């Protein structure tokens, strides 16, 4: 038997033999995202670029932070000599400027799921973790602009009708009844997600015409929304092109799920706490990228060389 230390040494030597194979061709449509890691208790940033069409990882490296300088350097390193047409990124305000400086003709798709998280955050900032059913319905109207949430909206309409029919004018008792209805909705959404997962279905995407129509109705009724969501509606309208690129170019994905899945598949939450040096981080990320791209890490011949 071999000691854990010896096996770890074999592992690191084998990883050090892995040579990075730089992409010589790409689709021109990419995900870019970041993940924060720990190195000896210090936070560092993992910068990653993935081709949306081929699925290949073009970059997976660590830097001390996610400054504009670090991001520009990473993008240039990953994409130098390759076509650059579009990116899907989250809604960080720095990304459009960075991309425009490096690639003036590149288009941007903002991650719709990131938009949904912001909408939910703004809703709970105004109303707490248990917003009124009507405000919850308004939030789902916004979710429904780019993805089809008709099923959830119909359920909320049913619950709102029951609430209006059964409330008695006693504030405390009405609030308790609304709380029961909110719980019913949460259970409904949870079961809906499970059903979609079992059946391998995603939430359907809206077409550009559907999005335009739904958003026009929201703008017309914007006075019924909370103040923060009214402001969010204005921002969506201002940046409409960055939310709808996926509807105008079939290669572009509406969310950053494609790179989030890579992060989840390659480093678990516990793994992220285990790095003791910059070398260990670089070694692990190099192995993640190589293995994802189909390189064999531990061939019989390489193991014999290590011995």
Describe the role of every protein-language-model region.
Residues 3-88, 93-101, 105:
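RNase H-like nuclease fold core
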Residues 7, 33, 55, 87-90, ...:
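Mobile genetic element proteins and their domesticated derivatives, centered on retroelements
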Residues 40-44, 120-122, 287:
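Short, solvent-exposed polar/charged micro-motifs at secondary-structure junctions
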Residues 56, 106, 122, 126, ...:
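Phosphate/oxyanion-binding loops and surfaces in catalytic or ligand/nucleic-acid-binding neighborhoods
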Residues 87-142, 263:
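Conserved beta-strand -> loop -> alpha-helix junction used to position metal-binding or nucleic-acid-contacting
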Residues 94-96, 136-307:
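Acidic/histidine-rich catalytic cores and adjacent linkers
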């Amino acid at each position: 038997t071999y000691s854990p230390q010896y096996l770890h040494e074999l592992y690191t030597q084998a990883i050090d033999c892995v040579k990075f194979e730089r992409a010589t061709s790409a689709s021109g449509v990419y995900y870019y995202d970041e993940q924060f890691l720990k190195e000896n208790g210090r936070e560092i940033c993992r910068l990653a670029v993935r081709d949306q069409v081929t699925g290949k990882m073009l970059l997976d490296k660590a830097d001390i932070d996610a400054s504009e300088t670090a991001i520009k350097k990473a993008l240039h390193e990953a994409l130098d000599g390759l076509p650059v047409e579009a990116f899907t990124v989250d809604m960080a305000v720095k990304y459009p400027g960075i991309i425009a400086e490096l690639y003036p003709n590149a288009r941007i798709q903002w991650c719709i799921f990131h938009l949904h998280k912001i909408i939910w955050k703004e809703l709970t900032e105004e109303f707490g973790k248990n917003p009124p059913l009507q405000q919850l319905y308004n939030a789902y109207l916004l979710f429904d602009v780019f993805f089809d949430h008709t099923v959830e909206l119909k359920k909320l309409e049913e619950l709102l009708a029951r609430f209006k029919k059964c409330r008695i004018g006693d504030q405390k008792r009405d609030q308790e009844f609304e709380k029961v209805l909110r719980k019913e909705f949460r259970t409904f959404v949870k079961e809906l997600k499970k059903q979609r997962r079992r059946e391998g279905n995603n939430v359907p995407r809206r077409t550009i015409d559907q999005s335009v129509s739904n958003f026009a109705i929201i703008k017309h009724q914007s006075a019924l929304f909370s103040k923060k969501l009214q402001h969010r509606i204005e921002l969506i309208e201002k940046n409409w092109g960055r939310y709808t690129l996926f509807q105008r170019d079939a290669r572009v994905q509406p969310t950053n799920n494609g790179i989030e899945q890579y992060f989840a598949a390659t480093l678990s939450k516990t793994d992220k706490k285990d790095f003791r040096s910059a070398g260990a981080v670089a070694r692990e990320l190099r192995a993640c990228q190589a293995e994802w791209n189909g390189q064999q890490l531990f061939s019989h011949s390489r193991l014999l060389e290590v011995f």
